[in-house]
Amino acid sequence: MQDIQLDKLLSADMSPENAQQVMQALSQSLNEHNIRYYVDDAPTITDSEYDRLMQCLIKLEAQFPQFIVADSPTQRVGGLALAKFDQITHLKPMLSLDNAFGEADFSAFHKRVTDKVGEVSFCCEPKLDGLAVSILYRHGVLERAATRGDGTVGEDITENVKTIKSIPLKLRGNDFPEVVEVRGEAFMPKAAFEALNERARAKDEKLFVNPRNAAAGSLRQLDSKITASRSLAFYAYALGVVEPDSYSLGKTHYEQLQQLKSWGLPVSNEIKVCEELDQVFDYYKDILTRRSDLPFEIDGVVMKVNDIAQQQRLGFVAKSPRWAIAYKFPAQEEMTLLEGVDFQVGRTGAVTPVARLKPVFVGGVTVSNATLHNADEIERLGIKIGDTVIIRRAGDVIPQIVAIVPERRPETATDIVFPHNCPVCGSLVERLEGEAVARCSGGLFCEAQRKEAIKHFASRKALDIDGMGDKVVEQLIDKELVQSPADLFKLTASMMTMLDRMGMKSATNLAAAIEAAKTTTLARFLYALGIREVGEATAANLAAHFASLDALRVATVEQLTAVEDVGVVVAQHVAHFFAQPHNLEVIDALIAAGVHWPAIEAPSADAQPLKGQTWVLTGTLNQLNRNDAKAQLQTLGAKVAGSVSKNTDCLVAGEAAGSKLAKAQELGVKVIDEEALLALFAANR
């Protein structure tokens, strides 16, 4: 459309039908110009012409709001701010990558790959230092976007992602799948980061530490208008879910990236296919050399097996693909002074020495603290207070002391002495044989461990106190209403109305849930105690083996190792826990408060038809809760594992079963669906 034509149209008495046609044409034109500018890097109109088209569309949409379309470029910034982010379950897990920190690591990865599938080529790309994002298009229109989160569940950031101008609200052309999930990195270019901090400096506001933090903070704004002002960018690096399955995709990773680009999605210009190992190392060195000149922050390069069929043969491990690796750049290093050491107590009782450093700028941030990990690390470094140390940001994230500078040690340097008593509760600090970490023996008595211990105690898989969420626990402890788990059972509804946003009705419901939680099982009770390395399965095995708490309390390490799946280390943790007077006092107080469970009867052989078998659950179960299914299988004698191996007897495959199903089929493991599982349970009631 020419400017003069637009002027005439806007000044005329336009009919609704004409307005709708013009608005659709303007939206399509502006979206295409966005792609030409941000993706193709080949704009065909000036900025002023683009602005003129946009203003025309804005005026028409104000006059005819009923014709605003979802992919209109005016809809990039939403209306009201959100109260919170909703959760989104990924259709396909967003896995992380394993790391290589040098040629030896990458060569070992290369050997593992070629041993499995023969010769390979790699699609190489910069590892952007931003935030992983999943974007779902349905019928070509952006439907939703989410953060990686824990890989299974992320946060809904759709409105914020729409503000990123390089991301098309509607895919280009018509040749795309009905559903396509695009994965990539949202990041803040260096120039945008500098401009953002300049604006903050002018307003005397807190500065962002680095572009990655700025990008993450910008994407997690509840008000998308703030995100829109931050000039974020995006590069696509992979496809996720594609429907229908029959849609013809490229046979290589590089070809699939070109498909994404043809649909209007931005893809890095630094991507290269390397056929030989030497070419991979040359690519790495080239990007490393040009790192400071690139318009965005990177912390390495990503190497992916280019052939999709080879990727599928290689498959996945629990948290990462076997066909890709992040080849990280060497961390940046600086020297500074160790001014002192503080000892922190973590939620599991781990006592960790933390170095207090003279502040130093390294790897893009100012570092004033670094973990010294444990006594062995202090001894290995030979470090003393007053030493000059070399600080590195390992992986460009975690500050780490890697060495001392002996020639700079002053005569006043002093030894680092580990405390004999917990700096929080005064209990003895102990270090079990074979363990690197020293721990406070206070257990449930220690204030540093108290909040997390009580959160765990009340959690769904433990005593399952409905309504007792993390924030409620924190308030109960902060207001000194609860000091130990047993105090939960002394709470009344009127006491809990002291909590924020807790009316009498909610408090009465919570009091009822606390009362109901007194009736539990021995397995749940043991899990709730938070004994180190005692998960649900181990707690169930301990309960089944000893049948009573009294028998378990006096069990020796030797007796404990006779329990299924309990090794020496776990046995030591259990014995150590029950040897601490503080912990026994808490247990006795819980029983005195009314916590109880039914007696355990030894199961007959007929009642455990799956004894000795290993089962695995995968995918979504529609009629059964995953934990209930697991518990029923264990009742029938099965061991329920988290991964498929040659020792797996049966896999239960729910909807959207992924890599576990593929591996089971590859190994010839028996596979059943949810209906068959329900039938099994019904037959053994």
UniProtKB/Swiss-Prot annotation:
Protein function: DNA ligase that catalyzes the formation of phosphodiester linkages between 5'-phosphoryl and 3'-hydroxyl groups in double-stranded DNA using NAD as a coenzyme and as the energy source for the reaction. It is essential for DNA replication and repair of damaged DNA.
Cited SMART domains: BRCT, HhH1, LIGANc
The protein, known as: DNA ligase
Keywords tagged on the record: DNA damage, DNA repair, DNA replication, Ligase, Magnesium, Manganese, Metal-binding, NAD, Zinc
CDD domains noted in UniProt: BRCT_DNA_ligase_like, LIGANc
Organism (species): Shewanella sp. (strain W3-18-1)
Binding-site residues for NAD(+), renumbered to this chain: D47, S48, E49, Y50, D51, S96, L97, E125, R148, E185, K304, K328
PROSITE patterns: BRCT, DNA_LIGASE_N1, DNA_LIGASE_N2
Stated family: Belongs to the NAD-dependent DNA ligase family. LigA subfamily.
NCBIfam families documented for this protein: dnlj (TIGR00575), PRK07956.1 (NF005932)
Catalytic activity: NAD(+) + (deoxyribonucleotide)n-3'-hydroxyl + 5'-phospho-(deoxyribonucleotide)m = (deoxyribonucleotide)n+m + AMP + beta-nicotinamide D-nucleotide
UniProt-annotated binding residues for Zn(2+): C422, C425, C440, C446
Enzyme Commission no: 6.5.1.2
A single MF term (Gene Ontology): DNA binding
Cofactor list: Mg(2+); Mn(2+)
Gene field: ligA
GO cellular component: cytosol
